Amino acid sequence: MLNALTRDRLVSEMKQGWKLAAAIGLMAVSFGAAHAQDADEALIKRGEYVARLSDCIACHTALHGQPYAGGLEIKSPIGTIYSTNITPDPEHGIGNYTLEDFTKALRKGIRKDGATVYPAMPYPEFARLSDDDIRAMYAFFMHGVKPVALQNKAPDISWPLSMRWPLGMWRAMFVPSMTPGVDKSISDPEVARGEYLVNGPGHCGECHTPRGFGMQVKAYGTAGGNAYLAGGAPIDNWIAPSLRSNSDTGLGRWSEDDIVTFLKSGRIDHSAVFGGMADVVAYSTQHWSDDDLRATAKYLKSMPAVPEGKNLGQDDGQTTALLNKGGQGNAGAEVYLHNCAICHMNDGTGVNRMFPPLAGNPVVITDDPTSLANVVAFGGILPPTNSAPSAVAMPGFKNHLSDQEMADVVNFMRKGWGNNAPGTVSASDIQKLRTTGAPVSTAGWNVSSKGWMAYMPQPYGEDWTFSPQTHTGVDDAQ
């Protein structure tokens, strides 16, 4: 039998043991919760990066709108559509989407209600997104994005093109089956990562690959042949240039370092971003990791050249000499001297990382003159980035020069300094471009169309001396 003193001591020791066990259990629970929270935060952070890779914010944010709340006007060949609200708002956004719903929308272009989204969303490329990347992006949109109760705008498309059910047929006809994740057949892991970035989240082919009769991207990878990344159709009256290794009109004269710097800052010594690519750099690629930029560059430099005309010859100095003598009655030369030479120089070399060269520039000598004509008429903006914080604006000349004068200077630049671009731009071409938005050429579409126009926001404030650029480049920069 235990005496009272012994019994009390045992009870006291048992209580102390219970307290210690409870404390240890509480610490374990707290540690587990903290560890889970850290894991969740890491997943959200990873998802934010994947969303940057995919450039979601550029399309799903209206000019001066709230991030990811949609409302961006996109003028397609069949009518106007508006990007949707992808914040976690349960009524107007995707707050009620499960991970399965989210995955189906990204990879198949099918909404929670079963309707097919318009292929302005690059879901054929997003089908390449890995399970881990989709899971991370879902965590970001559900827990890292502020919900915005903004109702989606209805598309402005005439019947019968407004019907969505044919989009399922379009998907079946033109969207190939994709294997998610990195292509395991590529032996070099860095090149494989670059291929994944270019053809998956980066969806580069949406602009840099020509389109077919159904307005579909002609090729989603090297299996598509020479069309793949060989230069796109008119989108916002900009022609995305070839990303193949062609010396004249592609990346043949670019180094890997050039590509990395271009994607990070928007400018290198011999080129600068223009049109929609300004948005891509501002919103997406400047935020990519150095390893991902290097992988992208390495993959692009692995791409072979495709057959092309001889659009660049040897500069014999005659263009520079003509300009040094005042143009001597050459209409295009005189327009150039009075409006262009102060930045792009008489020898067409420009100023490194400020005013791109015109001599040998792929944008100038490419077969389709639409981009050059568009920047002459409407101007352009070199956006500020973290690594190159200065913005540079080129004014448009549509209110200063006649259509004939703009045509003259475009033709002059396409034939000067050894440039040997084909064709001639007329005053009528400029007039249509300026007033109706019709591209000078529609070769990339295989159809007569003004192409897509996505009025994109830019990360500029009202206090800048130029109005915020739109994806059309119609920014009226001062």
From Swiss-Prot:
Induction: Constitutively expressed. Optimum pH is 5 for ubiquinol oxidation activity. It is found in: Cell membrane. Disulfide bonds: none annotated. Its EC number is 1.1.5.5. 2,6-dichloro-4-dicyanovinylphenol (PC16) and antimycin A inhibit ubiquinol oxidation activity more selectively than the ubiquinone reductase activity. This is Alcohol dehydrogenase (quinone), cytochrome c subunit. Pfam families: Cytochrom_C (PF00034). Cytochrome c component of the alcohol dehydrogenase multicomponent enzyme system which is involved in the production of acetic acid and in the ethanol oxidase respiratory chain. Quinohemoprotein alcohol dehydrogenase (ADH) catalyzes the oxidation of ethanol to acetaldehyde by transferring electrons to the ubiquinone embedded in the membrane phospholipids. The electrons transfer from ethanol to membranous ubiquinone occurs from pyrroloquinoline quinone (PQQ) to one heme c in subunit I (AdhA), and finally to two heme c in subunit II (AdhB).
